[in-house]
């Protein structure tokens, strides 16, 4: 039997989740860390930069999907591994900062897979059963959060709208992968899933690589950018899987009502 009234502790957890999920600006975080405006960095890239970024994002998500469909279910839970995952991603970022845009095709699939495993560990710590393909694809979904084209700040156009849109894509992909695996990556449900996530992930990658490609950034700056990058997705993952955990306790409708009653920074909610 589900609980109907949220405890004070769970309300606070939901507020923290909303702060992360509705204020996902990776560009602002990178700017604050390095003092280099992302908009200015984007203007310094060559005219053809979007093609390799798009290809790299697509390749990274395709690689991550194979991990999600297979070995991700063996990921251990807990958040203690966050520091290790950060260290590994930071190391790949040092190479990206030293070699710039040409290194992206090599660096991004590696760092994305590491981030996916970190996301999965957070998911399991929040009670997700990673033997379920839907839970594993929910890990992949984190890469699509915060990269919503044309997003406005209304609550209905934020996190829950993104989840609703992804849910339609995920159901078809989960059914196909559950029945046939990933033997045919060109199958329409799989293609739609990869394209959906890659498009949104690519927006965030563009902001990352724009700053990373600035000549003065170098290896140290590239490492710092990757630290900010994985920390961003770890925060989004914790928010996402906190909401899902609370939905399992109180039901989706109750959690959604509380979530939408809060301001975007989570500072106010329904009085209890």
Predicted regions located by residue number:
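Terminal, membrane-proximal amphipathic helices
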Residues: 1-92, 117-272
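Glycine-rich active-site/cofactor-binding loop and its immediate structural neighborhood
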Residues: 88-106, 113, 117
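Short hydrophobic alpha-helical segments that form membrane-spanning helices or hydrophobic packing faces
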Residues: 107-111, 222-225
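Bulky hydrophobic/aromatic packing residues
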Residues: 110-113, 233
């Amino acid at each position: 039997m589900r609980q109907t009234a949220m405890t004070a502790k769970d309300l606070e957890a939901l507020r923290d989740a909303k702060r992360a999920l509705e204020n996902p600006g990776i560009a602002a975080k990178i700017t604050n860390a390095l003092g280099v405006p992302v908009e200015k960095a984007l203007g310094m890239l060559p005219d053809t930069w979007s093609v390799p970024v798009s290809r790299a994002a697509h390749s990274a998500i395709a690689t991550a999907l194979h991990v999600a469909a297979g070995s991700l279910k063996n990921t251990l839970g807990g958040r203690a591994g966050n520091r290790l995952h950060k260290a590994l991603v930071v190391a790949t970022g040092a190479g990206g900062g030293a070699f710039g845009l040409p290194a992206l095709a090599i660096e991004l699939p590696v760092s994305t897979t590491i981030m996916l495993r970190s996301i999965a560990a957070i998911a399991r710590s929040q009670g997700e059963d990673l033997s379920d393909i839907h839970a594993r694809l929910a890990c992949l979904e984190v890469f699509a959060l915060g990269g919503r084209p044309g997003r406005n700040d209304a609550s209905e156009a934020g996190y829950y709208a993104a989840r609703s849109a992804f849910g339609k894509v995920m159901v078809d992909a989960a059914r196909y992968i559950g029945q046939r695996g990933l033997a045919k990556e060109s199958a329409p449900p799989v293609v739609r899933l990869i394209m959906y996530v890659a498009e949104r992930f690519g927006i965030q990658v563009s902001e990352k690589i724009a700053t990373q490609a600035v000549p003065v950034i170098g290896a140290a700056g590239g490492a710092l950018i990757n630290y900010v990058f994985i920390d961003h997705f770890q925060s989004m993952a914790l928010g996402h899987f906190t909401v899902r955990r609370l939905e399992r306790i109180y039901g989706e409708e109750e959690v959604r009502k509380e979530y939408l009653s809060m301001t975007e920074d989570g500072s106010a909610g329904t009085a209890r």
